[in-house]
Design a protein with these regions (language model features):
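Bacterial N-terminal signal peptides
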Residues: 10-18
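Bacterial N-terminal signal peptides that target proteins for export
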Residues: 1-9
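Long beta-sheet-rich domains in secretory-pathway and surface-associated proteins
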Residues: 24-143
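Intrinsically disordered low-complexity regions specifically enriched for long asparagine
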Residues: 6-7, 20, 108
Length: 143
């Protein structure tokens, strides 16, 4: 009976410690570089131009020089990233600061209705975005 009691106590102690150490480990992992925009899912018409204002936030104690990219967009969806009037492919952010850049996405006139997903990346940081095209597009514009 003493052996059974000791095993039960050991099991109780181990089960009590494991969840706390697991939770603590997850909470201690900081997100060092973050991309942010409040407009993560929007609805537009074919032919629209979308202008995103995106913050690159550096929560580290070191300078971050991040490569910027957009993935997941078809070649018919033209896009450009700018800040200060310059086209960007890389952006430097001082420690504990943020920099804002603009992403312009042109929705083609000939596009099917539906939801389109793409990702903006800055180094390892990723910002998933979603554009919903509410109506079927055509080649013609209305005048």
């Amino acid at each position: 009976m003493t052996m059974r009691t000791n095993c039960f106590l050991l099991l109780t102690v181990l089960l009590g410690i494991l969840p706390m150490s697991n939770t603590h480990a997850n909470d201690s992992i900081p997100k060092s570089v973050i991309l942010y925009t409040p407009y993560t899912k929007i609805s537009v018409s074919p032919g629209a131009s979308i202008d995103y204002s995106i913050d690159l936030i550096n929560n580290t104690d070191k300078l971050v020089n991040a490569n910027l990219s957009v993935s997941g967009l078809s070649s018919s969806w033209k896009h450009e990233m700018k800040s200060g009037g310059w086209n960007l492919s890389q952006l430097a952010v001082l420690p504990k600061e943020k920099k804002t850049f603009n992403l312009k996405v042109d929705v083609p006139l000939k596009v099917s209705r539906g939801s389109y997903h793409f990702v903006v990346s800055a180094g390892e940081a990723q910002l998933p975005l979603n554009v919903v095209v509410a109506q079927q597009g055509t080649y013609q514009t209305e005048f």
